[in-house]
Amino acid sequence: MSEQNNTEMTFQIQRIYTKDISFEAPNAPHVFQKDWQPEVKLDLDTASSQLADDVYEVVLRVTVTASLGEETAFLCEVQQGGIFSIAGIEGTQMAHCLGAYCPNILFPYARECITSVVSRGTFPQLNLAPINFDALFMNYLQQQAGEGTEEHQDA
């Protein structure tokens, strides 16, 4: 009976925190006089590390760059971190948990932080759409499988 309990999947959020915030408006104040039709670019990255047995830190980095033509209106980067207790899974399931499930939890916090910082820069409201981290993770796995196939073909 105790062996069964040890293999059960457990997941617990220990802490969610803002690890880093950066905001730049390099062309302020003259950018405020321009028509606000920005091109908005969103970059995402995740990283994870094991802190202790069954304890992991996951950091979601979200970078938003708004440009008006060739000029950068603003650049905002947030690193949203979380510490999670995860046990009873391994391999691809653990990779999915750290690379998709945890970022899904962290993204709303990062999105709120970015929205707040951008509004403090007196730019119009920025509403980031939800991100499907499960689909991004599947794309990543497909790319990794494709790269592995290419390496075998080259050999």
UniProtKB/Swiss-Prot annotation:
Keywords: Chaperone, Cytoplasm, Protein transport, Translocation, Transport. One of its GO terms (molecular function) is unfolded protein binding. One of its GO terms (biological process) is protein tetramerization. It comes from the Bacteria. One of the proteins required for the normal export of preproteins out of the cell cytoplasm. It is a molecular chaperone that binds to a subset of precursor proteins, maintaining them in a translocation-competent state. It also specifically binds to its receptor SecA. PANTHER family: PROTEIN-EXPORT PROTEIN SECB, PTHR36918. This is Protein-export protein SecB. It comes from Shigella sonnei (strain Ss046).
